């Protein structure tokens, strides 16, 4: 069986990290599926999904690391095409990726004790994001 749900987010932009673990648990609790996999996917090219320990230190560390790897203020060919100044946003999202697959058993996500599922907004402006959540199993 396959079911499809959505998580709606209004982001502030620029390196915002949003914990969506509770939303995923809520969706699983409403699902008719008890065991399987949950696929989480963000449409678009400047947002990403990952897991981390959602705590204040890492919430600061991740954007700082991204700035070291893919700095905002350098030349990106994307900006030559679109003149929107978010070439770095696309590259950061590409590095992290748009999707996750998480197994679950008895309607419980199989995650580590300190592991949360997060959405990362890399664009330089706010967005309305509609994250697709596909539940597969029995």
Tell me the role of every PLM-derived stretch:
Residues 1-138:
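Active-site histidine-anchored catalytic micro-motif
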């Amino acid at each position: 069986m396959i079911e499809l749900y959505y998580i709606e987010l209004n982001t502030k932009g620029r390196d915002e990290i949003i914990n969506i673990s509770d939303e995923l648990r809520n969706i699983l609790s409403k699902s008719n599926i008890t065991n399987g996999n949950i696929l989480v996917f963000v449409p678009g090219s400047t947002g990403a999904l990952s897991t981390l320990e959602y705590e204040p230190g890492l919430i600061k560390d991740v954007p700082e690391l991204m700035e070291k790897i893919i700095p905002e203020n350098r030349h990106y060919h994307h900006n030559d095409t679109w003149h929107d100044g978010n070439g770095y946003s696309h590259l950061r999202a590409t590095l992290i990726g748009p999707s996750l697959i998480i197994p679950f058993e008895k309607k419980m996500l199989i995650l580590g004790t300190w592991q949360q599922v997060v959405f990362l907004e890399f664009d330089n402006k706010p967005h309305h994001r509609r994250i697709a959540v596909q539940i597969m199993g029995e």
